[in-house]
Each structure stands twice: as structure tokens, then as C-alpha cells.
């Protein structure tokens, strides 16, 4: 018996050494490596939807890397893979895509099926960035940008760097959307892309309730939403009299929320603290010299932020009747989860107050 065990052990070890100790891997040239994925739909009738999934794949050449877009069209997202494989000369490799771009039409139908098929595959890239686009996602994937092997590479960088301005967050990864989708008291937003004469551009954010897109807001409202919802980004606030007289203030925002409940009604107190520097002053030169003038400017900017926040809250509560600020999550953490409360409805009828505090820490290098 011992001889048999020893013989089998030697045989297994020999096979392990002969095969190199691991399964044979395929070379990159034999694989279709994705740069980005685009999700579109086509209406084939009153109750029939055709899913169109496009893959932007790298083409490796001796001196440069390019990309090519192939699409699959079928009645289910899974079937599009089979349809697409009939048109490409390499095996498709899942898990390296940089961006997932969803057309507005698909987003309005719902994106749960997209997330399901992505996360059912253990090789899927859960850190790929997600965005919604106007028009067809395939058109954006096919757009050529000088200096980049694919438009997906450019869009990835564009979304990542967006957090340096407009108070954008970095919570646009696939895993971020997946986590928020079924979390109590949480909705999510995604960057909204449009095509311009200069190429793709972030034009605001798409608003989601559950897994469906219910609206879109422009970049100015997006700045306010970002401050109110995450309070972790950076952006510019401007006090302006006319085209020649203005002050630009570049600041980092931090948010704190307090929640109270009385007779079943919720009240939320949002505190925004902005700290930063004046990067352009064409309005009041006394600000850099006079403490009283600086305090006056800080108060004026605080009031401007509060006014803009209150306008957005009115739109959120009356027009969308949804919670894009994750206030329901705050209330659920304090008063209990799984109580059956519809936090979107509760927030639409809640009292929400905003207090902004602006602090000027620096004023550039001075005047010359």
C-alpha cells in the first residue's frame, strides 16, 4: 500500500515538473483583450428588446497599439457573447476592461441585468468605471482620439481626474454601483457623457432610482449634488459682478449630517465645511489685506452655497421625489434598518436644512 502511495506521489510530482507547474497560458496575441464595453438596446417591437453589447478590443502591432469594436446583438445579454464571437478571430478575455458605458436608453430600461451577468463571472473587473452616455455607446467606443489606443483609455482618465474639480467623487466603479443598488437608503449617480466636436465630455450626472435612470442634471447642479451627497471632492466657487469683476475660490468640501425624528417625521441637518484658497481675485483687492473684508467674502460665499443647495433640494424633493444624498442611510443607521420605510418617499417629505461654512486659508502668491 505504501509503495502505491509513493509511486503515485512521484508520478504526480513528475507531471507537475514536466508541465511547468501550472496550466499553459495563451499569449496576448491570441486573445481579444477588451479596453471597454458598451451597452445599447434596440426596440424590435412593443414588448421585444434586442441587446447590443459592443467590445472595444486592443490590436497589438509592432510599433503601436490600436483598437477595434465588435458588437453582438441578441435577445439576452449572454447570447450577445455567442453572436459576437462569430465575428472575431480571437478568444474574448473577460476582466480587463477599463470602462463600461451604458446608453441612456438602456439605463432607463434598467441595468440590473448588466450587473448580474458581470458579477456572475468571477473574472469580471469590478473596478471598471461606469458611465451613461447620450446616444449609442458603440459610437463613443468607435471614436478615435489621437495619442490613445482607444477612446476607453481616454474616458477612464477623464472620469478618474474629474474629482479634482466640480466636487466629483471616485465612487463610479462597477463594485460601487453593485453595492449601492440594493443597499437601504442609497441611490446612485453616474457620469453622463456626450459627444462634442472636441470628443467625449462629462456633461453632468445621470440620476438613478433602484436600477433605472430617472433623470439627468447639468454640471452646475452636479456640483451642488456632489457637495451635498459626498462632501469629499474639490471645486471652484465664484463670486461675480460682471465678466471683468470676479473672485474664484478653489476649495475642498466636507459634509456632516445629523438626523432627528419627531412624530414619525425626519429632519436632516447638513453641515458643509469648505476650506481652500482664492485663486483669482479681480473684484476686491482688500480681501488679501483686511480681515474684515475677508470675513465678509467668506460669509457671502457661504450664503451663495446655501442658496444653491436649497434650490437643488427643492428639485430633488418635488420633481424627482428621490434621495440622491444617502440621507436614508443615515436615518436607518440611527433608527434601525429593515423597518419597511421607503426612504425615497420619506426624504421627499422630510425637512432638510443646509449650513455652509467657507474658510479662506490662502490667497495665492499675492499681487505684483
Q: Where is each model-derived feature located?
A:
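Membrane-proximal alpha-helical signals and transmembrane carboxylates
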Residues: 2-368
Amino acid at each position: 500500500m505504501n509503495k502505491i502511495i509513493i509511486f503515485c506521489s512521484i508520478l504526480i510530482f513528475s507531471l507537475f515538473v514536466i508541465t511547468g507547474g501550472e496550466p499553459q497560458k495563451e499569449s496576448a496575441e491570441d486573445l481579444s483583450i477588451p479596453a471597454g464595453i458598451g451597452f445599447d438596446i434596440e426596440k424590435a417591437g412593443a414588448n421585444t428588446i434586442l441587446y447590443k453589447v459592443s467590445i472595444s478590443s486592443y490590436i497589438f502591432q509592432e510599433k503601436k497599439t490600436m483598437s477595434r469594436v465588435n458588437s453582438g446583438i441578441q435577445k439576452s445579454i449572454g447570447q450577445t457573447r455567442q453572436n459576437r464571437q462569430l465575428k472575431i478571430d480571437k478568444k474574448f478575455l473577460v476582466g480587463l476592461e477599463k470602462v463600461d458605458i451604458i446608453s441612456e436608453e438602456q439605463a432607463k430600461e434598467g441595468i440590473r441585468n448588466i450587473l448580474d451577468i458581470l458579477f456572475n463571472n468571477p473574472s469580471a473587473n469590478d473596478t471598471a468605471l461606469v458611465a451613461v452616455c447620450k446616444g449609442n455607446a458603440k459610437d463613443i467606443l468607435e471614436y478615435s482620439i489621437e495619442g490613445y489606443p482607444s477612446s476607453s483609455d481616454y474616458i477612464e482618465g477623464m472620469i478618474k481626474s474629474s474629482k479634482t474639480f466640480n466636487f466629483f467623487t471616485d465612487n463610479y466603479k462597477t463594485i460601487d454601483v453593485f453595492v449601492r443598488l440594493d443597499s437601504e437608503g442609497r441611490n446612485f449617480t453616474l457620469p453622463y457623457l456626450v459627444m462634442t466636436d472636441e470628443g467625449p465630455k462629462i456633461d453632468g450626472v445621470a440620476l438613478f432610482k433602484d436600477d433605472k435612470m430617472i433623470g439627468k442634471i447639468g454640471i452646475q447642479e452636479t456640483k451642488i449634488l456632489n457637495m451635498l451627497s459626498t462632501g469629499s471632492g474639490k471645486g471652484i466657487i465664484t463670486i461675480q459682478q460682471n465678466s471683468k469683476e470676479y473672485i474664484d475660490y478653489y476649495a475642498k468640501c466636507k459634509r456632516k449630517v445629523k438626523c432627528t425624528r419627531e412624530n414619525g417625521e425626519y429632519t436632516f441637518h447638513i453641515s458643509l465645511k469648505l476650506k481652500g484658497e482664492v485663486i483669482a481675485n479681480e473684484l476686491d483687492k482688500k480681501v488679501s489685506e483686511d480681515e474684515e473684508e475677508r470675513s465678509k467674502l467668506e460669509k457671502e460665499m457661504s450664503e451663495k452655497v446655501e442658496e444653491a443647495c436649497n434650490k437643488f433640494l427643492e428639485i430633488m424633493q418635488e420633481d424627482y421625489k428621490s434621495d440622491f444624498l444617502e440621507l436614508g442611510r443615515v436615518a436607518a443607521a440611527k433608527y434601525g434598518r429593515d423597518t419597511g420605510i421607503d426612504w425615497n418617499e420619506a426624504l421627499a417629505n422630510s425637512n432638510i436644512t443646509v449650513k455652509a461654512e467657507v474658510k479662506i486659508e490662502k490667497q495665492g502668491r499675492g499681487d505684483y
